[in-house]
Amino acid sequence: MAYVPLSGTNVRILADVPFSNDYKNTRWFTSSSNQYNWFNRKSRVYEMSKVTFMGFRENKPYVSVSLPIDKLYSASYIMFQNADYGNKWFYAFVTELEFKNSAVTYVHFEIDVLQTWMFDMKFQESFIVREHVKLWNDDGTPTINTIDEGLSYGSEYDIVSVENHKPYDDMMFLVIISKSIMHGTPGEEESRLNDINASLNGMPQPLCYYIHPFYKDGKVPKTYIGDNNANLSPIVNMLTNIFSQKSAVNDIVNMYVTDYIGLKLDYKNGDKELKLDKDMFEQAGIADDKHGNVDTIFVKKIPDYEALEIDTGDKWGGFTKDQESKLMMYPYCVTEITDFKGNHMNLKTEYINNSKLKIQVRGSLGVSNKVAYSVQDYNADSALSGGNRLTASLDSSLINNNPNDIAILNDYLSAYLQGNKNSLENQKSSILFNGIMGMIGGGISAGASAAGGSALGMASSVTGMTSTAGNAVLQMQAMQAKQADIANIPPQLTKMGGNTAFDYGNGYRGVYVIKKQLKAEYRRSLSSFFHKYGYKINRVKKPNLRTRKAFNYVQTKDCFISGDINNNDLQEIRTIFDNGITLWHTDNIGNYSVENELR
């Protein structure tokens, strides 16, 4: 219990002091004179010039007042001076009115240690559990505070914004892969038709690639290769003619549609105009002696792929701005990137180290569609260099590897590769995994049996044999031999396309940026809580005692407060701040509907 002086002078019993000894709230002052004037303006129930306090033996100090108890019902506070403390003003709560007789009342009290020692205590750096902090940066963006509050925020979100972003707006690409060249080259004396044309396409490879840009309505962009107009055929005409040519259709390995081929192309959506590098592409006319020519684009080489940047705008755009900036953080707000094809990722918007949400698009010309969408500067430290920042963005990527195949009539090899693509990949993964596990587990003993069997036999018993690294190599060779054997079987199968018609016909292209926010009911509930109690910060620092216009809430843990104060009172002050208290800077104490802006 706080120390009480033995006597007091200028004792004033006051009414209408709007806080109590539970120390949930108090009035905070900037000077002792302001403090004195504030209390001195309160209604006075009774005054005494000099008194000796009683009740110390019972640990219930009181002052005897020559008034009937009925006259003191409004008494809530006492202020007095003490000559032994240099006429310091002491402040105290009235805790009880005790009836002595019809003319005398004992007014019990306890010292208000906060008001009494407010200008004697010194707050040192302490562990601050929660307090009111700066909500918004100077540019209007929310300050970052992601410490878990442990509060319920519901299980559902409102979708507040949906945006679709595509690498080249409405333009997409049909990719045709063949085993050999399907076109002649104008101006060349000897035709390269049916020649194997190994080239650089991200890496050295033996296949031939053709691309055909088009729009959903079947039209094609005005396409220039260098300065020459490529005069591309409409996409339907191109498909009709190419499948009418036996030599061409039997040469095709795969066909698919993709949004991005791995190159930042010079494309103007408004003009529907595409410009291509003549060193990388050439016009290709595919024809035979029975069918007319169709014009498309042959890929000569692509030494390196490039990432395309899509600027989606302000990362906070679309969210409803709340009074409390923490409600802009995860999990109260979520940015989702999805393609509506089973690929999605949730982002914590505050960890995008940029004012804008920028998406990096990476693609390639492989044997099937594969496009990666990554968020630039997500979880990227500002100390990272530019190149490393781009690399770091790959850690948060959405990869669309839906086949997007076009239905083809082809030889057994292509149909087998397409129809069993997932199976083959799973076999390869299993073989490599088992090979590694065999090495770790001492599979060296299996080497003899691997050497004694044929490659094809090894492939047929993948699930039943002990796999070592050597076995893995033999099994891979066996599977490749199986594929090579199939290449000799004549055309006989029809390969149907996958979900390409559904995805593209319904407009599911590129990626969608979806902004989600808490349901309004939970936003209101959390907003009122944060308005009253501030945010968890869990930091060692000096507390914010007067940074807001109306009130500051402060809660500490094992706080460090010093000063020329007796130990009992000092310990009580520390306990008050550890329990949490609201420091009011206006007389409207307890009114949380007031605006509480930063000073």
From Swiss-Prot:
Keyword Repressor included in the entry's annotation: no
Compartment(s) where it occurs, according to its Swiss-Prot or TrEMBL record: Virion
Keyword terms: Late protein, Pore-mediated penetration of viral genome into host cell, Viral genome ejection through host cell envelope, Viral penetration into host cytoplasm, Viral short tail ejection system, Viral tail protein, Viral tail tube protein, Virion, Virus entry into host cell
Chief place where the protein resides: virion
GO annotation terms (biological process): symbiont genome ejection through host cell envelope, short tail mechanism; symbiont genome entry into host cell via pore formation in plasma membrane
InterPro entries tied to this protein: Gp9_C (IPR048710), Gp9_N (IPR031772)
Gene Ontology CC terms, in alphabetical order: virus tail; virus tail, tube
Statement: the UniProt record of this protein carries the keyword Ribonucleoprotein: no
Cited function: Distal (knob) tail protein that plugs the end of the tube before DNA ejection and forms a channel perforating the host membrane during ejection.
Quaternary assembly: Homohexamer; forms a hexameric tube structure with six flexible hydrophobic loops.
Name of protein: Tail knob protein gp9
